[in-house]
């Protein structure tokens, strides 16, 4: 179902910036292993599994699923139903939402559940259908009516390799009940036809374990003769939202409440305005509200309890899964994908992940929305989490909006993230899961030159008036330096570099425009960032056709980070002035970007004016948000508007993911 409003809160229920249901059985959806994938990866990515041996259409009952993807079950679905290709083949949802809010978020006496136990719940975790909404999440399958003799019986079962990932329900005696491999359908049922429903219990995590396909096999026994018919289904992939989708609810951190309080059942209203407790928080919220109003988005800010963690973007990504519905529609469930960020210093085997991301289970999991996590437990306790763990934060993941290029069609875009082939990369089991979906083929760019390692430090996307419908907003340190050189040429080199901020709240009090151009860390930072951004753009051009016509460059100023002796990473930079590229597209023609605090000319910030001019031809306007104290000047590397927000976006205008042609 489309859920255009987030689930109401249950009544019972860092980013390292400094360098009535009974307890459910485990559901196999938390951890992955590192293994050679071989042919299984190819199967998951291409959707090409070998079909069973061809056989004549058996007389009598047939099993039918939505092979032609029109949301209906008709004879048109029967051709080629035993195979599955990207163009044709039936689909099923991973039924991971919690339609009756029966998933526990705490143990006995309010004890905190371990991360894996907290995630091990959803509608598919047991064989109970939770009302009409849960029923709607089942893929429709039918056994056609046929005139069989009185003694005829039949079974329907998933193939053994997929059986633990698939559950079949049958309508019997007026209700949908689980149908096991040994359960027999009667002659009377076969004469009338049998309505079935199928759910997957999970997404594809590791193709070496399960590539997402199931063969449903109907065996009919009549007078000692057994006939067989079958249909193949694939689980719908996890689809990341993209920045052209309009924001439904803008999320930002509530520092007055933490996840443990939600888990203990403290009542919580995410629309109630919390008391600002962080420096600059009130100003940040004020400007964020103004920007949303300007974008025509009047819904209240959606407050997310973090207990003090400001980096909301690094906690999870918003996604969805869908299957065809009648009338060309999609039937969807929302998915919150928890960050695989194993926290240095605090991670334990029971609580390995970022604590603030746990609030998603109590606050966001519910009707039409599930929460998943995927990480390598072997990273707990490793020194690598201290130096490289931030690459796994979800602020390091984005989505190229939809595009077509050289015969490739990506109707829901492509995942893009920062990483290398080495340690400066996200959790391997997490990126393997993304690749295993077979859609939105992930693309990695090197972000090892950034102190925090996140792609959102220099890249975002906004709607635009061109054939793709969007442009990339990219940080340009060369442009930032040229703007400062122009000020020096005008005789203004002695003016302060940072405008509107008390000197004591800057990294280098008293630094002038001319001094910034001479400062070695800024000169070196500009060069490191320029090379890193140019390399990223080359990758995007080669692999996604992102030529200059689809790039808007905004000024930036990067500084090299002074690293301690023995630190294993070298030549790292951070944004010295707030990064205009680190903003949020509302999807409605407004871009929320951090105030620049650069020098001014004729009363206008020179960096802000340059950014506005750069975007002027796109149809997207900038709304400036004050984030210096709240985000930019925090820790060693800081962050900006995108880093400290998250968004639930509207899905009503999406194009079907299954029309992708990679």
Task: Give a label for each model feature.
Residues 1-56:
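Secretory targeting and sorting signals
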Residues 57-662:
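Histidine/cysteine-enriched polar flanking segments
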């Amino acid at each position: 179902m489309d859920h255009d409003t987030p689930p109401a809160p249950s009544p019972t229920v860092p980013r390292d910036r400094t360098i009535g249901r009974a307890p459910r059985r485990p559901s196999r959806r938390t951890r992955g292993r590192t293994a050679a994938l071989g042919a299984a990866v190819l199967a998951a990515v291409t959707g090409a599994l070998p079909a069973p041996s061809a056989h004549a259409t058996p007389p009598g009952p047939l099993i039918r699923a939505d092979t032609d993807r029109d949301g209906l079950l008709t004879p048109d679905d029967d051709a080629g139903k035993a195979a599955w290709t990207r163009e044709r083949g039936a689909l099923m949802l991973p039924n991971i939402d919690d339609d009756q809010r029966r998933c526990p978020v705490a143990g006995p006496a309010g004890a905190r559940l371990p991360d894996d136990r907290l995630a091990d719940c959803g509608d598919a975790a047991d064989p109970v259908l939770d009302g009409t909404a849960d029923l709607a999440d089942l893929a429709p399958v039918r056994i056609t009516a046929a005139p069989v003799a009185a003694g005829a019986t039949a079974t329907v079962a998933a193939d053994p390799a997929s059986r633990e990932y698939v559950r079949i329900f049958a309508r019997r005696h007026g209700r949908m009940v689980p149908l096991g491999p040994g359960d027999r359908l009667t002659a009377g049922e076969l004469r009338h036809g049998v309505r079935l429903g199928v759910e997957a219990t999970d997404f594809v995590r590791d193709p070496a374990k399960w590539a997402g396909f199931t063969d449903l096999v109907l065996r009919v026994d009549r007078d000692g003769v057994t006939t067989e018919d079958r249909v193949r289904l694939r689980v719908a992939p996890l689809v990341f939202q993209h920045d052209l989708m309009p924001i439904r609810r803008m999320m930002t951190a509530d520092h007055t409440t933490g996840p443990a309080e939600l888990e203990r059942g403290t009542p919580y209203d995410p629309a109630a305005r919390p008391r600002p407790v962080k420096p600059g928080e009130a100003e940040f919220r004020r400007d964020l509200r103004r920007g949303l109003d300007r974008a025509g988005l009047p819904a209240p800010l959606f407050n997310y309890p973090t207990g003090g963690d400001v980096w909301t973007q690094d906690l999870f990504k918003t996604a969805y899964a869908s299957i065809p519905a009648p009338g060309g529609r999609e039937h969807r469930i929302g998915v919150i994908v928890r960050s695989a960020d194993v926290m240095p210093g605090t991670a334990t085997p029971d609580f390995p992940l970022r604590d603030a991301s746990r609030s998603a289970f109590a606050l966001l999991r519910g009707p039409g929305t599930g929460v998943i996590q995927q990480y390598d437990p072997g990273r707990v306790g490793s020194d690598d989490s201290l130096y490289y763990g931030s690459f796994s934060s979800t602020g390091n993941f984005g989505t190229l909006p939809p595009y077509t290029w050289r015969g490739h069609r990506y109707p829901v875009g492509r995942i893009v993230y920062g990483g290398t082939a080495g340690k400066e990369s996200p959790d391997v089991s997490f990126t393997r899961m993304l690749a295993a979906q077979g859609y939105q083929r992930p693309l990695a760019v090197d972000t090892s030159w950034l102190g925090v390692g996140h792609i959102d430090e220099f890249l975002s996307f906004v709607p635009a008036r061109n054939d793709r419908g969007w442009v990339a907003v990219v940080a340009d340190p060369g442009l930032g330096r040229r703007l400062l050189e122009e000020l020096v040429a005008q005789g203004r080199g002695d003016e302060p570099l940072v405008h509107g901020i008390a000197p004591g709240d800057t990294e280098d009090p008293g630094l002038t425009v001319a001094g910034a151009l001479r400062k070695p860390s800024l000169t070196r930072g500009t060069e490191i960032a320029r090379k890193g951004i140019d390399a990223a753009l080359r990758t995007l051009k080669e692999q996604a056709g992102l030529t200059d016509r689809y790039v808007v460059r905004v000024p930036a100023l990067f500084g090299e980070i002074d690293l301690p002796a023995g630190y294993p990473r070298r030549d790292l930079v951070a944004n010295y002035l707030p990064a205009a590229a680190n903003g949020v597209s509302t999807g409605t023609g407004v871009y929320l970007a951090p105030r620049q605090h650069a020098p001014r000319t004729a009363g206008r910030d020179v960096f802000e004016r340059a950014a506005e001019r750069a975007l002027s031809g796109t149809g997207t306007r900038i709304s400036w948000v004050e984030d210096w104290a709240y985000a930019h000047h925090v820790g060693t590397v800081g962050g900006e508007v995108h880093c400290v927000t998250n968004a639930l976006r509207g899905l009503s205008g999406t194009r079907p993911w299954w029309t992708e042609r990679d």
